[in-house]
Amino acid sequence: MMIEIGLIGKKIGMTREFYKSGQSVPVTVIKFDKGRVIHLLSKEKNGYNAVQIGFGKIKNSKLSKQMKGYFAKKNTEPKKILKEFRVKNLENFKEGNEIGIEIFKDTKFVDIRSKTIGKGFAGAMKRHNFAGLRASHGVSISHRAHGSTGQNQDPGKVFKNKKMAGHMGDKNRTMQNIEIIKSDPDNNLLYLKGSIPGSKNTQVEVKESVKNIRKLTMAEKIEKIEKLKKIPEKKKK
């Protein structure tokens, strides 16, 4: 059964782990705080079923008067982030319940969502991988320009989403089917294969993979290869 809710943690850096075969794999480490169910939204009252979960700690002094009252009414400590997850039914959830990385106990692949590193204002060559203009032969002080931006008097405008220089990075991005290499429930750490967008301390949302494809993990692939190696070859006639 698919896990409908997710967790929000922060990226604390990269390291590497080793498979039983000795092969190393780069991993990104995500640190989670225990999430708490703050509020339940029902189809009868709100038009859809959802679970509101709070993540992270925040000082009471940084909250607005309305949010102070909200958390006091729910009889829970203030949370930095409130996130809604739509669910089919609310039977398994109750206000005040804590949720940790144990929800990914039987999960092999996850989808993550985080914000990319901001690069500031960038030209077309860096931002869109344009080739640029020629180094000589008629080109003067336009070597890194993006070239033509439109047509003629008709349509007489630059179309929206034209690739030009502008602000690069600092965008929300989703990566799918990221393999879980290891989980550490005692320290609330999740080790994900490869790199993910964002710098250290970037907020990362992790959910079970929606595509739910039948894909082998790298450890399973290595194990399969090792088994095939042990099968003796047929003697040549």
Feature locations, PLM:
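Extended basic (Lys/Arg/His-rich) segments that typically form rRNA-contacting surfaces
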Residues: 1-237
